[in-house]
């Protein structure tokens, strides 16, 4: 069983007091191709492409120009670097070495630049969303550039797991990069809803955090069987069998 999560736009590169070796992303060669294309762009090109302000464009331009493929094994792990709602829910800062190692086996972070990241892959500062409309070496966009590579990498990692199930906690933007995977293996998609009057509705900010909390729950409880995630109960959520349908598992809270 492997869970999938989207990356965050914000990165914190402050080194933690942690004695654990980081790894090099498996698609570093592909990332280099993408970055070489981005390095040719000026700030005035990046801002409309990435839909960012000029100030953020300057920062992004600097990150792109500074990016390289040199790894020393002491970089900050991506799972600790990403800072967004999902990663606030995951809250990996208090993970033990054993937690991080389990998470490294059971989670893959989808990425526009790196394809698929392991949690303990070393961080290089970057900003590139999967949905960015950029042509790389003749491809229509990043989805076209990556093709089936990300899916095949996840499936290969899944071979080492007893239960061949994907827990899809990624956003549609990122899951789209491997959407054909449900033809190969079972994909369970948890959905998190809040009570609003007499109905339950998805509230995006809470749903993002809950996705990270689900990864935390899987990690802390060493869950390897998908059925066990139905016991997820962080922050008042509980599995709602009535609203769930097929492999779309709904978790609600009042």
From Swiss-Prot:
GO terms (BP aspect): response to hydroperoxide
Coiled coil: none
GO CC entries: cytosol
Family to which this protein belongs: Belongs to the UPF0246 family.
NCBIfam families, per the entry: PRK02101.1-3
Listed name of the protein: UPF0246 protein CPE2152
Classification of source organism: Bacteria, Bacillati, Bacillota, Clostridia, Eubacteriales
